[in-house]
A protein has these predicted regions:
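Carbohydrate transferase catalytic cores enriched for Leloir-type hexosyltransferases
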Residues: 1-339
């Protein structure tokens, strides 16, 4: 459809976390002409999945200042997509804002101060100004209604997904895998404590993701840092099990990617994880270390259960595809623009 779209590209700078993946996978699939413009305050070096988009860089030392003062001036389009929860408060064109979670409000001590301030200061005004709101899960939509009074009719569920890149491999690995930014709310302290309590010989623990902050990983635990998609897929495919003990999530992409790659999954009941993983993974309550330990021991010693979860996870992941999410976002942007 003919629709001029400009996208706040801050989640794509410098490296992609979950919100960056969401932004890129949907932006690259938007069915609009001309191709969308991704604007940012610094160069976007990883253009995987967004090769067909157009780019605009207006260098600024701070992403929030750029969003609030530069983006409104350059937003010459029919509609803006704010994929990171906020939009410029002086924006003069229609906008759609995507909500991933409210952890900076519910768990401020588990975020950097600049993250808390940038989100909490602008979220209420952003939701008031947005024509439409996308939420990655029903849980986040309900929180937006309850805390900010967003009319439910304005909210569309646009979930995260996977594509055919994440597929089963040959397996063969003997390690427990965690993938995600190393930050307090991801429950890494719970995972490390439980892993340390496992009887010897225990499977190695591999932690993969950006360094983040306020998380100390002891010696003896493998840490890969950020890895590219090819390496990430291989890690998923070869894991004996994937464990995601997050204390709070809006959606949680890594368990879905792990399921698509055939890794048996243990995760917590938070955000959208029960929506897509119930019955296809072992789920425990956030912060329940005894239940997490029991689940790891159960899965480690039961090959038939691992095989069952592998097959169920692969099938379940097929219900969550980026193509469908991009279609929903295209429709939402069109509605917001009045096209």
């Amino acid at each position: 459809m003919n629709l001029r779209v400009i996208i706040d590209g801050r989640p794509l700078v410098p490296a992609r976390s979950g919100i960056g993946v969401h932004t890129a996978e949907i932006a690259g699939r938007l069915d609009v002409t001309p191709s969308p413009v991704i604007a940012s305050h610094a160069e976007i070096t990883n253009r995987q999945a967004i090769e067909h988009c157009r780019f605009r860089v207006d260098h600024a030392p701070n992403g929030i200042l750029w969003q609030q003062f530069v983006l409104p001036r350059i937003a010459d389009a029919d509609v803006l997509w704010g994929p990171h929860g906020t939009i410029p408060i002086t924006l003069r064109i229609p906008a759609v804002v995507t909500l991933h979670d409210f952890s900076s409000i519910t768990m401020p001590g588990r975020h950097l101060l600049k993250t808390v301030l940038s989100f909490n200061v602008f979220i209420s005004e952003s939701l008031d100004r947005a024509r439409r709101v996308a939420a990655v899960s029903k849980a986040i939509a309900e929180e937006a209604v309850r805390w900010f009074g967003v009319p439910r009719r304005l909210i569309e569920i646009v979930p995260n997904g996977v594509d055919d890149f994440f597929r089963p491999g040959d397996g063969g690995g003997d390690y427990i895998l965690f993938v995600g930014t190393l930050e307090p709310r991801k429950g890494i302290a719970d995972l490390v404590a439980v892993w340390n309590s496992l009887p010897e010989p225990r499977l190695p623990l591999m932690i993969c993701g950006d360094p983040g902050w306020r998380v100390r990983v002891p010696s003896g635990v493998g840490v890969t840092g950020w890895v590219d998609r090819e390496r990430l897929r291989t890690l998923y495919q070869r894991a004996r099990m994937f464990v995601y003990p997050s204390r709070y999530e809006g959606f949680g992409i890594p368990p879905l990617e792990a399921m698509a790659c055939g890794a048996p999954v243990i995760a917590t009941r938070t955000g959208a994880i029960p929506d897509y993983a119930e019955g296809a993974a072992l789920l425990v309550d956030p912060g329940d270390r005894e239940a997490l330990r029991a689940a790891i021991l159960r899965l480690q010693g039961n090959e038939s259960l691992r095989s069952e979860l592998r097959e169920k996870g692969i099938e379940r992941s097929k219900q969550y595809r980026w193509d469908r999410s991009a279609q929903l976002m295209t429709e939402l942007l069109s509605e917001a623009a009045g096209a």
